[in-house]
């Protein structure tokens, strides 16, 4: 089994190898699945998204339009300091962790138990520890980001991973 740091490097490389057309096609498939997921859960009104970096799955315009049409409010992470983050709305107001119905969470790798590997700073693991089990935590990834690894006790287990496949 590969160690987490090697796995991070490998997945960053794999994402970087996607050409624009491949990435656009995969992102479109995933965005369609995200919309289908949200349609089945009409109680989700406050959704935590992320601003994609380093070739993470992007939220496309049709997805963002879907959120507006369905009156789903989106919020985004904002780094507070080297250990903590918060989520803010479009007016830069901090959102209480318990007011978020569902989190769409980026990742570098995931395993069969829905544990994720991120960039290794622990921002999401610490933030999600403030939330309740009722709030959905959904990992967003490409299929090729699946890997077998041993999770650490502090690694947060997600409810579901949504991929292109």
From Swiss-Prot:
Binding site for ATP: 4-8, 116-124, 126, 154
GO cellular component, one term: cytoplasm
Main location group: cytoplasm
Keyword terms of this UniProt record: ATP-binding, Cytoplasm, Ligase, Magnesium, Metal-binding, Nucleotide-binding
InterPro entries, per database record: FTHF_cligase, FTHF_cligase-like_sf, NagB/RpiA_transferase-like
Domain of life: Bacteria
Keyword Lipoprotein belongs to the record: no
GO biological process: folic acid-containing compound biosynthetic process; tetrahydrofolate interconversion
Subcellular location as annotated: Cytoplasm
Record-linked Gene3D superfamilies: NagB/RpiA/CoA transferase-like
EC number assigned by the record: 6.3.3.2
EC top class, as a word: ligase
Cofactor: Mg(2+)
Catalytic activity: (6S)-5-formyl-5,6,7,8-tetrahydrofolate + ATP = (6R)-5,10-methenyltetrahydrofolate + ADP + phosphate
Positions annotated to bind substrate: 51, 56
Binding site for Mg(2+): 125, 155
Molecular functions per Gene Ontology: 5-formyltetrahydrofolate cyclo-ligase activity; ATP binding; metal ion binding
Any Pfam family the entry gives: 5-FTHF_cyc-lig
Similarity comment text for this entry: Belongs to the 5-formyltetrahydrofolate cyclo-ligase family.
Function: Involved in folate metabolism. Catalyzes the irreversible conversion of 5-formyltetrahydrofolate (5-FTHF) to yield 5,10-methenyltetrahydrofolate.
Summary of subunit composition and partner proteins: Monomer or homodimer.
Name of this chain's protein: 5-formyltetrahydrofolate cyclo-ligase
């Amino acid at each position: 089994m590969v160690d987490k740091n090697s796995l991070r490097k490998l997945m960053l490389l794999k994402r970087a190898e996607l050409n624009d057309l491949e990435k656009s096609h995969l992102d479109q498939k995933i965005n369609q699945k995200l919309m289908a997921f949200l349609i089945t859960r009409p109680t989700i009104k406050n959704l935590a998204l992320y601003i994609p970096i380093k070739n993470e799955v992007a939220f496309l315009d049709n997805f963002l339009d879907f959120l507006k049409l369905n009156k789903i409010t989106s919020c985004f992470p904002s780094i507070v300091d080297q250990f903590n983050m918060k989520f803010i709305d479009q007016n830069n107001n901090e959102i209480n962790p318990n007011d978020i119905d569902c989190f769409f969470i980026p990742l570098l790798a995931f395993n069969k138990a829905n544990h994720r590997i991120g960039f290794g700073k622990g921002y999401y693991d610490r933030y999600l520890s403030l939330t309740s089990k009722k709030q959905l935590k959904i990992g967003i990834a490409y299929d090729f980001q699946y890997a077998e690894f041993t999770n650490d006790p502090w690694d947060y287990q997600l409810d579901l991973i949504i991929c292109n496949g």
